[in-house]
Amino acid sequence: MPKRKLTNKYYFSVEGETEQWYLYWLRDLINSSDEATHKVAIDCKIEKSPLRRAKRMNITGKTEIWHLSDYESSDPFHVQQFQDTISEMKDARKIGKNIVYKFGYSNFTFDLWMILHKIDCNGSKAARSQYLTPINRAYNAQFLSMDDYKHEKHFHSCLNQLSIENVIDAINRAKRIMKANEENGYILQKYKGYSYYNENPSLMIWEIIEKILQDCGLI
């Protein structure tokens, strides 16, 4: 009789449905893998406010939560929104629940992470809508708009093309992007204990995805 696998649990707050769909897809992919040493449980809420998410959690002991958030643009409104999110993650440490918030940001958006599963996406974009062409190329699709791509049925059609190997490819491509940013002399911004680049592409969502795969013996 096969040995029963232990379950690793991960906590998230995300800003949109696509991020949640992705995390549940990854959970199911790992849990169906014979190679995985552990099962995965994902506690993920669509919640733009990290502080509200933390306050509503019923937990005991030290807990790590990852907030997946988009940089959106360098417009002052979006930059302020981004920094307000960081402030809330910092404040979540002070509510007496022993919560540590980690930041899985994407610049511009989570769609960059989806593209990296299939192809490189190293060039800077002037607008989020410019992800549509590489998305269509990566997934051999003909989505008419970003909203069309994010329709639940269409987004899952992209996920269904992916494997653990594609996730590992995305991690490696993301690491190369961040290394290139450093080599290009971009300034790593520091704000309330969190780091990020103003320049796109840049992203840190790969850190928690890599950790999940490592914890399950898949990397």
Where do the protein language model's features map onto the residues?
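C-terminal accessory helical subdomains adjacent to catalytic cores in phosphodiester-
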Residues: 1-7, 20-40, 52-59, 63-64, ...
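Catalytic nucleophile-elbow at a beta strand-turn-alpha helix junction centered on a G-D-S/GDSL motif
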Residues: 11-21
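Conserved beta-strand segments of the P-loop GTPase G domain that flank and frequently precede/overlap
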Residues: 13, 67-70
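Acidic-and-aromatic substrate-binding clefts and catalytic sites of carbohydrate-active enzymes
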Residues: 41-48
